[in-house]
């Protein structure tokens, strides 16, 4: 899902210092990206799109809505799990990242439908 990866890159690098600050406060060390895990996430997102969004969408608008809902669920699972287990994971970051994920997967679904 190259489209989602491109959209996410804007989010990640557009606020790199904010992301670094959040994750360094949680892991108590400099931010390190595991590229294999990142690629696997986008592979799972592509599987979700082709199995749950594309077959059940009649047009781009429906694909956007279903993609946004899928993104909300995927990113909320990540962010709320982090909030539940890491005391330094901030609510404002969890909310912003979840909303971003909803928008990003919605836009990616709209674009590639």
Named regions from a protein language model:
Residues 1-113:
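Juxtamembrane/disordered regions of integral membrane proteins
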